[in-house]
Design a protein with these regions (language model features):
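Membrane-lipid interaction segments
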Residues: 2-464
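Primarily a LysM-type cell-wall glycan-binding module
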Residues: 456-494, 499-511
Length: 512
């Protein structure tokens, strides 16, 4: 700790709340007559697309749509895809009243279900899991007051000794943006699109004055029927670059971004198949800093009562992004049958756990992979879960910590599949995938700093003396000795050639 003569102050940046909520989104699809009738549903996928929030007092209203894609075999024997986007809306009571702009919401769709109600009618449902959080910013200052409640006069305040320390903290802000782009995709000249989807994969995120620049690719996934009657899948990278308004951002801020493909449409042009993509991007920027907190105080001439406050301060652990490769196999597969082949593959990654130890943050999860296999006029879906880990270096003092309790950490992570491959090898299917992961974590630490020193009556006069000696307890700090004796810390340090943080071994100290 450091002894600082000036008055400590600053903003105590903490976490106001970090909570979860869940609900369901459901809807029905009634397909037009030009769609083939449903003979067999092959798979259903869902993606949550948040688009609104409103905060009034402690009430939060948020909503959006869920984009469903249902792949099925029609009565014509071919694969078809139908989409729907039912809306969802929820109301949540917040633990505290905060400005609406400071509330962050992340929603994801899980466990999509599909039920056939009629040859051209489907019932859809997905579970929605939402994270709602907000940071707090509370002014902190140290003040001196008299016993009567007035501000202490300058002469009395000058007798105060303050023991302060610098505590790391971080300011976190988030912004959102909706953009669009287009580009050609890899497909045969006569290919007929069956299903398309996409994901956002930023590779460069930089902060500058009041803006965040995000560069990356939209990975377009296309399932198509070729002229020879076989199905092929392809992935194409469509580049994008966006400058997102970010009020308060500065050069050098640590930044990250992730996003969702809201819609992907395929059209045929003279250059081939072209993808038109709309996407949402969330960007976060962090600015590490410090706040000076007063741990203890006393007056060398007056009796002093201390007032303390509860404070929770967050500091940055990590903010990182990168790629991860995963692989696995399906041991017993329909792909082992004669003339069977892999039609398509898809994966939904999820990150379930984070651990912080040895100077590293380890985010663990799994990619739930679906492999579509054509055989004997049918298409079946086979599942495999591929575990993965993403590691990032911790910053600041956490770099040297052996471990950090999970209760002190808050984190978020997002993952997207940028490429996935499946290969038939005998009677099994080997699957590999590339993921893009964006993760950030912060540590919350509880303090009870001194916010007020109330100066009361003058200490009893110890009488005239040339030298005053104090016998400290072994292990007692020089600061504690000076406080107990009502001595000037600077004099104790100067006379004994020690520092306030030094621990005593029981030898006497001259305090005057």
């Amino acid at each position: 700790m450091e002894k600082i003569k000036g008055a400590p102050d600053g903003l105590l940046r903490g976490i106001e709340f970090d909570m979860g909520a869940s609900g369901d989104c459901s809807g029905e699809i009634v397909m037009p007559d030009y769609y083939p009738e449903i003979r067999k549903v092959v798979s259903v996928s869902a993606r949550a697309l948040p688009d609104s929030k409103f905060v009034s007092d402690k009430n939060l209203e948020y909503g959006g749509t869920v984009s469903f894609n249902v792949l099925y075999i029609g009565d014509d024997g071919a694969l078809s895809c139908v989409s729907a986007s039912p809306e969802y809306s929820f109301t949540q009571t917040l633990p505290a009243e905060v400005p609406g702009a400071s509330v962050w919401i992340d929603t994801c769709a899980e466990a999509p279900q599909c039920r056939v109600l009629a040859p051209r009618k489907l019932s859809l449902r997905a579970r929605l899991r939402t994270r709602i959080c907000a940071d707090s910013s509370t002014p902190y200052a140290f003040s001196a007051a008299s016993a009567a409640g007035d501000a202490a006069d300058g002469e009395c305040a000058a007798t105060l000794e303050k023991h302060c320390r610098s505590v790391p903290t971080v300011m976190r802000c988030r912004t959102s943006f909706t953009g669009s782009t287009s580009g050609t995709v890899n497909a045969g000249a006569g290919a007929k699109p069956v299903m398309c989807d996409g994901c956002v994969a930023p590779h460069t995120v930089t902060a500058s004055a009041d803006r965040i620049t995000v560069k990356g690719n939209i990975i377009v996934h296309l399932l198509a029927l070729e002229e020879d009657g076989t199905y092929t899948c392809s992935r194409s990278a469509v580049p994008f670059e966006e400058e997102i308004p970010a009020d308060g951002a500065r050069d050098g801020d640590i930044s990250s971004a992730w996003g969702r493909a809201a819609s992907v449409g395929i059209s045929r042009t003279d250059a081939g198949l072209c993808a038109d993509i709309e996407y949402d991007i969330d960007a976060e920027w962090c600015r590490p800093g410090e706040v000076i907190l007063c741990d203890d105080a006393y007056s060398t001439e007056y009796k002093t009562e201390l007032g303390r406050t509860d404070a929770e301060v967050i500091s940055m652990l990590c903010c990182a992004a990168g790629s991860v490769g995963v692989s696995g196999e399906i041991a017993k597969s329909k792909a082992g049958e004669p003339q069977a082949y892999v039609v398509d593959t898809a994966a939904v990654p999820r990150i379930e756990k984070a651990e912080f130890s040895g100077g590293r943050a380890v985010f663990s999860g799994a990619a739930d992979v679906k492999v579509y296999i054509a055989h004997s006029g049918e298409v079946d879906c086979e599942d495999v879960s591929l575990p993965f880990k993403f590691e990032a270096a911790l910053s600041g003092d956490a770099e040297h910590a052996d471990s950090i309790p999970s209760g002190e950490c808050v984190w978020s992570a997002h993952a997207e599949v940028t490429d996935i491959r499946a290969r038939v090898d005998g009677g099994k299917v080997t699957v590999s995938a590339d993921l893009f992961v964006s993760a950030e974590a912060a540590r919350k630490t509880h303090f009870e700093p001194v916010c007020e020193a109330v100066i009361e009556d003058r200490r009893p006069d110890g009488g005239e003396c040339c030298i005053r000696v104090c016998y400290p307890r072994s292990g007692e700090s020089v600061w504690e000795v000076a406080k107990r004796c009502g001595a000037s810390l600077s004099e104790v340090e100067r006379i004994n050639k020690v520092t306030g943080d030094s621990l005593c071994d029981g030898s006497p100290l001259i305090v005057k």
